Structures are given as C-alpha cells and as structure tokens.
C-alpha cells in the first residue's frame, strides 16, 4: 500500500478521535452501565484508535525516509523518555493493574496525540484542514447541547441516559444552591466544560480575526454562534478556574497581536484593570451572585465542606506526599485510577503536583519540558498560522487552570489541545523543511 493511502487512513482515524472525544463523558457512562469488566477498554477507545492510527504513519515515514525529521525534534525524544520512565515506574512500584493501566492512559494520551498529529500533518500538511473540520464538528455538538441545557432542557435531562452520582452527575450546583445549576454538556463535568470552552473561544476568536473579511454572511453568523455558545458554556459551567483561565488566555491572545512598542501600555492597562476589578468584586461580595459563585458562600444552606477547603486540603496533602517521596508514588496512585478496586484513593487538585505524585520530580520536569517545547513551537509559528496564536493563548489559560485542577486528566481537553498543537507543529515543520514532503502553503 502506498504512503498516500496510509496517510488517508491515519487522517480518518485521527479525525474520528478529534470529533468524537467530546462525547467521552456520555461514552464513559454507557460503558460503566453496560460494558462491565470491559468498561476501561471502552473508555480508552480514543487512545486505542490513536495507537492504530500511528501504525500506518510509521510505515509511511519509512517509505518516505522521513525519520530524520523526528530524530531532530526534541519533543519526540522527550515523549519517548517519558514513556520509558513510566515503564520503569510501573515495574518498580506495585499498584493494582487496573489503576496502572488507567494511569498510563491518562498520563501519556496527550503526548501520543501530539506525536500522531505532528507526524500526520508533517507528511500531509493539507490534513490540518480536515482535523480542524473534525474539531469544529465536535465543538458544535458540545456548545449546541450546552445551550440547550441552559435554555430548554430540564436540569436532570441526562439522568435518563444513566447519569447519576454513581457514574457522572447529570448536573451540579454551586454550593448546593439550586439557583446556580452547573451544566456538563457531554463532558465529564462542569470544570472540564469550562476548560474546553476556553480552548474553543481562543480558536474561534483567532480564526475570526484572521478570516473575517473573507467570510460570507452565513459563515460569520455560524462563527458568532460558536463564540456565543462557548461563552454560554463557560459562564454556566460556573467554573472559577475556567473563568480565570479565560482571562489569562484572552490577555495572551491580545498580546500576540499587539506591536512590541505597545506591550508596556498593555501591561499597565491590565494591572489597572485587575486592581479595579478586585475592588469591585470585593465591594460586591455580599450580593447573591458574587457571594455564591465567586466565594461559594451560600448563606441559606450550602455544603458543610466547602470546595475552597477541599482545594486547600488537597494541596497540603499532595505537597506533603511529594516532599516525602521525590521519586513519586507510582503510576495510577492518584486521581480516578486510585479509586479502583484495591487502590488507595488520592485526589490531587493541582496538575503539577498530580504529575509529581505519580512520576516524581523527574517526571514532572520532563513533562514541563515537553509542554514548554510545544508552546515554543507555537510561539515560533504565530506569524505563519492563526491557529498557533489560538493554541498558545489556550495553552496559557489551561496551564493556569492546572494550578487548581488536574486539567490534563480530562480526555476531551487534553486530546483536543495536544492533538491540534501537534498538528500545527507538523504543519510548521513541513512549511520550513528543505525539501518539504508536500506543499504547505494553506493557512486554513
């Protein structure tokens, strides 16, 4: 089979993952109800598809003698080193096999998505357009259902499909206040929906800035609907971390368009705005919205254990464990994998302590280096493709969310961002390679 067909097969499989991963919450619920012992494999469908997609790509690379491009890419070496480290840790530490399997999937799937997308788009730059289309389909489903949840559907609509406290709650509330219902859309919860909305907003806004003049009226309306729907999902997720991440992402996106001579003025304006905003929020702290949503202080009833206290307790415990175990505690030792049979539950609400808890300071350092490398490639490509600015800004926002939530532990968020980041990096590598394996002139 020639490389063209191999690449097409891989592109189709990768597109299915990118479009379908937004349904992961729904799929996970159905797997828990109907798949029994095979539920973990069903939940890992997208990782398995990415592994399958990597096989024809490896053959195509060999046929085109393009392995040198990957040897020269430091991120590829970093990902291989991280995978090797995980293998060593699994061999040394002994956790329940189910927990270790889930931990490996959660820890490595984002980097696998980056590798597959980088390879695919490097070999066939036009695949970037099809991947963006797949992402757009998934985004449309997510924000469309989110708007329906806010406007017309009953709050427990998802309960008829098996959503419950035993699987995924059909909805949540802010501090047990039924006046502030937090929606999920098809994702695993309100916080992942908020984080995903930050990514969608960055992509939609950056695309609009780049292509607004070329868009027809219907296309402008569709783009506006995506932006509005993403804002609805972000606001009604009531995710404070996502709101903060959206602010950081917006600042980074704006800064990427500002000429250097105005950067200082932008920084000063942001400082003033932040100070004024802080004063306004504090002065309105007794109003129902600010009291409930920002401070989670429900005077009427409220939960006994506040989420802020939970965050603080989680951070203190995680910092203590990481300090005592600089080599980590083992893959599958925290998060949802630690909730399985025979495991000891550890919930860590910080992405970086999450990494260090499982793989130690070395694993944390390797993953931060990989992330920094991915962001650096986006920075270098920001003037060549609008998507680079969008993903750079979204990455900054998601990393901010990671300070209070394990943002990369969510399937939809981690696969979408890393896959698109890898695709853009592959496009940029193809555009600047000499000779390039194919023309890479489209800016989509």
Regions found by a protein language model. Name each.
Residues 3-14, 18, 72-83, 118-161:
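Interfacial loop-to-transmembrane-helix boundary motif in multi-pass membrane proteins
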Residues 8-31, 49-108, 112, 398-399:
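N-terminal hydrophobic segments of proteins, predominantly signal-anchor/transmembrane helices
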Residues 13-20, 222-229, 379-405, 416, ...:
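Loop-to-helix entry and N-terminal half of a specific, functionally important transmembrane alpha helix
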Residues 54-58, 129-257, 373, 379-380, ...:
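Alpha-helical transmembrane segments of multi-pass inner-membrane proteins
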Residues 144, 150-154, 237, 254-302, ...:
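A membrane-periplasm/extracellular boundary helix in multi-pass inner-membrane enzymes
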Residues 247-250, 391-403, 407-444:
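Transmembrane alpha-helices of multi-pass inner-membrane enzymes
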Residues 254-255, 358-399:
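Hydrophobic transmembrane alpha-helices and their immediate junctions
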Residues 285-291, 295-359:
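Long extracytoplasmic/lumenal interhelical loops at the membrane interface
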């Amino acid at each position: 089979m020639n490389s063209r067909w191999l690449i097409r097969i891989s592109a189709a499989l990768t597109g299915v993952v990118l479009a379908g991963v937004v349904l992961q919450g729904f799929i996970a619920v159905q797997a828990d109800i109907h798949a029994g012992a095979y539920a973990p494999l069903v939940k890992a469908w997208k990782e398995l598809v990415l592994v399958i997609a990597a096989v024809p790509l490896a053959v195509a690379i060999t046929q085109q003698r393009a392995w040198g491009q990957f040897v020269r890419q430091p991120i590829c070496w970093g990902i291989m080193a991280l995978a090797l480290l995980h293998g060593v840790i699994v061999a040394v530490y002994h956790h329940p096999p189910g927990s270790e399997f889930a931990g490996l999937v959660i820890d490595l799937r984002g980097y696998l998505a980056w590798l597959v997308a980088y390879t695919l788009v490097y070999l066939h730059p036009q695949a970037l357009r099809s991947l963006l289309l797949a992402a757009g389909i998934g985004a449309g489903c997510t924000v469309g259902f989110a708007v329906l949840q806010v406007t017309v559907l009953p709050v427990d609509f998802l309960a008829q499909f098996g959503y419950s406290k035993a699987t995924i709650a059909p909805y949540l509330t802010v501090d047990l206040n039924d006046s502030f219902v937090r929606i999920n859309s098809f994702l695993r919860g309100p916080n992942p929906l908020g984080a995903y909305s930050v990514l969608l907003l960055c992509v939609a806004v950056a695309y609009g800035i780049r292509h607004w003049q070329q868009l027809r009226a219907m296309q402008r309306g569709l783009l506006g609907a995506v932006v509005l729907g993403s804002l609805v999902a972000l606001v009604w997720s009531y995710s404070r971390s996502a709101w903060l991440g959206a602010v950081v992402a917006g600042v980074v996106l704006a800064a990427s368009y500002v000429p250097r001579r105005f950067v200082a003025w932008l920084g000063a304006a942001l400082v003033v705005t932040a100070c004024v905003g802080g004063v306004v929020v504090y002065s309105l702290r007794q109003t129902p919205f600010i009291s409930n949503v920002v401070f989670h202080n429900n005077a009427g009833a409220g939960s006994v254990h506040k989420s802020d206290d939970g965050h603080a307790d989680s951070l203190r415990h995680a910092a203590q464990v990481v300090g005592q175990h600089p080599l980590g505690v083992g893959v599958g030792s925290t998060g949802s994998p630690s909730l399985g049979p025979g495991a000891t539950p550890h919930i860590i609400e910080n992405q970086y302590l999450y990494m260090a808890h499982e793989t130690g300071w070395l694993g944390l350092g390797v993953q931060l280096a990989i992330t920094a490398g991915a962001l650096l490639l986006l920075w270098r490509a920001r003037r060549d493709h609008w998507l680079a600015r969008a993903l750079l800004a979204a990455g900054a926002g998601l990393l901010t969310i990671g300070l209070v939530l394990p943002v990369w532990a969510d399937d939809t968020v981690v696969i979408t961002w890393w896959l698109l980041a890898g695709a853009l990096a592959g496009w940029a590598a193809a555009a600047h390679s000499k000779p390039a394996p194919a023309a890479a002139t489209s800016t989509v």
